[in-house]
Structures are given as structure tokens and as C-alpha cells.
Amino acid sequence: KALYAPFDATFPNQNQTRNKAVDTAPCEWYRRVY
């Protein structure tokens, strides 16, 4: 899951919580991470 790569490394348990927030705009979030 590249979408949660940054969170998976630091917050593997919070990756699920962020997933819901990213669900609203996965495309925009993906561009912000990279």
C-alpha cells in the first residue's frame, strides 16, 4: 500500500485511521505525499 507508506513506517496502527481521512481525496493526498 504505497498510499500509507509514510504512515506505515511511523504509524502502522494509525494507517487505518488515516485511510478513512484519505478516502475523501486519495488522489490529492497521494500527490501531497510525493
From Swiss-Prot:
User: GO cellular component annotations, sorted alphabetically?
Assistant: mitochondrial inner membrane
Name any Gene Ontology BP term: oxidative phosphorylation
User: What's the main place this protein lives?
Assistant: mitochondrion
- Tell me if Mitochondrion is a UniProt keyword of this record: yes
What PTM annotation applies here? Answer: The N-terminus is blocked.
Q: Note the topology in the membrane.
A: Peripheral membrane protein
Which keywords annotate this record?
Membrane, Mitochondrion, Mitochondrion inner membrane
Q: In which pathway does it act?
A: Energy metabolism; oxidative phosphorylation
Its annotated compartments are:
Mitochondrion inner membrane
Domain of life of the organism in this record? Eukaryota
**Subunit organization:** Component of the cytochrome c oxidase (complex IV, CIV), a multisubunit enzyme composed of 14 subunits. The complex is composed of a catalytic core of 3 subunits MT-CO1, MT-CO2 and MT-CO3, encoded in the mitochondrial DNA, and 11 supernumerary subunits COX4I, COX5A, COX5B, COX6A, COX6B, COX6C, COX7A, COX7B, COX7C, COX8 and NDUFA4, which are encoded in the nuclear genome.
Q: What function does this protein fulfil?
A: Component of the cytochrome c oxidase, the last enzyme in the mitochondrial electron transport chain which drives oxidative phosphorylation. The respiratory chain contains 3 multisubunit complexes succinate dehydrogenase (complex II, CII), ubiquinol-cytochrome c oxidoreductase (cytochrome b-c1 complex, complex III, CIII) and cytochrome c oxidase (complex IV, CIV), that cooperate to transfer electrons derived from NADH and succinate to molecular oxygen, creating an electrochemical gradient over the inner membrane that drives transmembrane transport and the ATP synthase.
The record's comment on protein family reads: Belongs to the cytochrome c oxidase subunit 6B family.
Name of protein = Cytochrome c oxidase subunit 6B
